[in-house]
């Protein structure tokens, strides 16, 4: 039945689009129905599709990377080093102090603003406006922390309207720890027209890492650049289009020889109801497929140390979020989601992905985990912790 409804909506697209452009000229989206895109649905498995076919695949549960502009991502890092991660947490006192700064009210206020945009579809003017707001908010956080002399945020532009946002906290080396979330949203039943509040997907991750960024800047050592490693926070554009924004960024990093030691993606951090309805304990879902096993193991340790709820292993398939872009570029990456994948939010990609379904207490647990991870790894000495994959 879902497929029939989607097909009917797709058939009505030309007429509806014309009406939409007439009544909402402020958000014109130029449709190119015949343009082809190269997608990868599994490692090495590619096909050419139209944009409508991309959305049909997504409606039917198929994830993919759109590699039209990034066909060689990772090709120069095939013999990259394998990174070793800590065996235990050692920064408990510092993280405990910083965690006191995490505030649910900030996440709620930021999410209310983020969901006020009609959509955050990456090809729309709304998507541009929402990314402008993300950059503005991140810069305000830096200013409020008095960190402007060392910490900075900038736009990473793309060939579509919405830009990505990168905040950088320089450390004593160029070795970098990345925390990511995607800022765009989509309504898979008519992306250029219908509302897509995207509260959980991925407004929740966006504001979770935004709050972690704010809390982290309460550390004078971090702001003063005393951490051994550089720390970056990424808010990606166009994840819903096939991980487009994150691929562009990690392709740029690969080409410039950036030393990324770890990347954690936070995509959907707020929904717990299906878990509770199934009689399962509230937990965070640690993804175990298509991720770096060493980083993933350490994340479990971080959850046990800094969260009030346990972790549960789960899988989400190929290219299920932006960590896949980092992984393909040859960088260690991991993904933590709100629950076991089968209990994740059923409202996403529709007009009903709203704040009312989310738990800010649960989002706070994700924030605690993320803060613990970024502080532990930010102050970790990676210099003696790598081995060449070619020797394995």
Swiss-Prot record:
A single MF term (Gene Ontology): metalloexopeptidase activity
Protein's UniProt keywords contain Signal: yes
Key words of the record: Aminopeptidase, Disulfide bond, Glycoprotein, Hydrolase, Metal-binding, Protease, Secreted, Signal, Zinc, Zymogen
UniProt cofactor note: Binds 2 Zn(2+) ions per subunit.
Name of one Pfam family that matches: Peptidase_M28
Propeptide: 19-82
The organism's place on the tree of life at top rank: Eukaryota
Principal subcellular localisation of the protein: secreted
Positions annotated to bind Zn(2+) 1: 182, 201, 267
Required cofactor(s): Zn(2+)
Disulphide bridges, residue numbers: 316-320
GO cellular component, one term: extracellular region
Functional description taken from the UniProt entry: Extracellular aminopeptidase that allows assimilation of proteinaceous substrates.
Name of the protein: Leucine aminopeptidase 1
Species, as recorded: Fusarium vanettenii (strain ATCC MYA-4622 / CBS 123669 / FGSC 9596 / NRRL 45880 / 77-13-4) (Fusarium solani subsp. pisi)
Lineage of the species this protein comes from: Eukaryota, Fungi, Dikarya, Ascomycota, Pezizomycotina
């Amino acid at each position: 039945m879902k497929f029939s409804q989607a097909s009917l909506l797709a058939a009505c697209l030309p007429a509806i689009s014309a009406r939409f452009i007439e009544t909402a000229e402020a958000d014109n989206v130029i449709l190119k129905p015949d343009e082809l895109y190269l997608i990868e649905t599994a490692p090495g498995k590619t096909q050419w599709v139209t944009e409508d076919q991309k959305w049909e695949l997504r409606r039917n549960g198929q994830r993919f990377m759109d590699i039209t502009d990034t066909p060689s991502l990772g090709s120069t890092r095939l013999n990259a080093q394998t990174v070793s991660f800590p065996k235990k947490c050692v920064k408990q006192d510092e993280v405990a102090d910083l965690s006191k700064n995490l505030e649910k009210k900030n996440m709620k206020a930021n999410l209310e603003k983020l969901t006020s945009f009609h959509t955050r579809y990456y090809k729309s003017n709304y998507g541009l406006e929402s990314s402008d707001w993300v950059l503005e908010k991140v810069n305000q956080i830096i200013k409020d922390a008095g960190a402007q002399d060392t910490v900075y945020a900038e736009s990473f532009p793309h060939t579509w309207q919405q830009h990505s946002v990168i905040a950088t906290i320089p450390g004593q080396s160029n070795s970098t720890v990345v925390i990511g979330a995607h800022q765009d949203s989509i309504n898979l039943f008519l992306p250029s027209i219908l509302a897509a509040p995207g509260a959980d997907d991925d407004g929740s991750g966006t504001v979770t890492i935004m709050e972690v960024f704010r809390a982290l800047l309460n550390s004078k050592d971090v702001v003063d650049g005393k951490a051994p490693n550089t720390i970056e926070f990424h808010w990606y554009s166009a994840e819903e289009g096939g991980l487009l924004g994150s691929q562009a960024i990690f392709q740029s990093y690969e080409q410039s020889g950036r030393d990324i030691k770890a990347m954690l993606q936070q995509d959907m951090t707020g929904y717990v109801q299906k878990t509770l309805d199934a009689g399962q304990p509230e937990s965070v879902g640690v993804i175990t497929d298509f991720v770096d096993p060493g980083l993933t193991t350490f994340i479990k340790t971080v959850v046990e140390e800094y969260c009030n709820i346990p972790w549960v292993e789960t899988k989400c398939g190929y290219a299920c979020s932006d960590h896949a872009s980092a992984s393909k570029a040859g960088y260690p990456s991991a993904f933590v989601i709100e629950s076991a994948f089968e209990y994740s939010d059923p409202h996403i990609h529709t007009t009903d992905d709203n704040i009312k379904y989310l738990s800010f207490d649960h989002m706070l647990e994700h924030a605690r985990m993320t803060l613990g991870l970024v502080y532990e790894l930010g102050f970790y000495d990676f210099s003696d912790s790598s081995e060449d994959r070619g020797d394995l």
